[in-house]
């Protein structure tokens, strides 16, 4: 799923029921996608090893924007080794309560 919807600025289709259980890399999947705000909290991401820049928002030298703010508390990220810039610039997302995500210091 690496860079699958990168730059698809208006993409907001309901992909909540996708089977992603065999996905190992999600790098930049929703990078620079400003409209995406679908609940994907039920995704089985337990096989994913890299989530770098999944929700990163950066364009024309400016960080920020986007509306993604869904509950990802049920995500099993125990196999993830890279969350670098996962939510960088995703100003609406509030990961404060997601202690299992916060363990990765370079996430934001």
What are the functions of these language-model segments?
Residues 2-102:
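Negatively charged
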Residues 103-108:
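A short, hydrophobic C-terminal helix/tail in secreted or cell-surface proteins
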């Amino acid at each position: 799923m690496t860079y699958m919807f990168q730059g698809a600025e208006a993409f907001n289709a309901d992909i909540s029921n996708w089977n992603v259980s065999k996905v190992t890399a999600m790098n930049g999947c929703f990078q620079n996608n400003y409209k995406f705000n679908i609940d994907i909290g039920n995704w089985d991401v337990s096989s994913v090893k890299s989530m770098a820049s999944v929700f990163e928002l950066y364009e024309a030298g400016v960080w920020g924007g986007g509306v993604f703010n869904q509950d990802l508390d049920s995500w099993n990220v125990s196999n993830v080794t890279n969350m670098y810039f996962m939510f960088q610039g995703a100003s609406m997302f509030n990961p404060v309560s997601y202690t299992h995500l916060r363990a990765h210091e370079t996430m934001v």
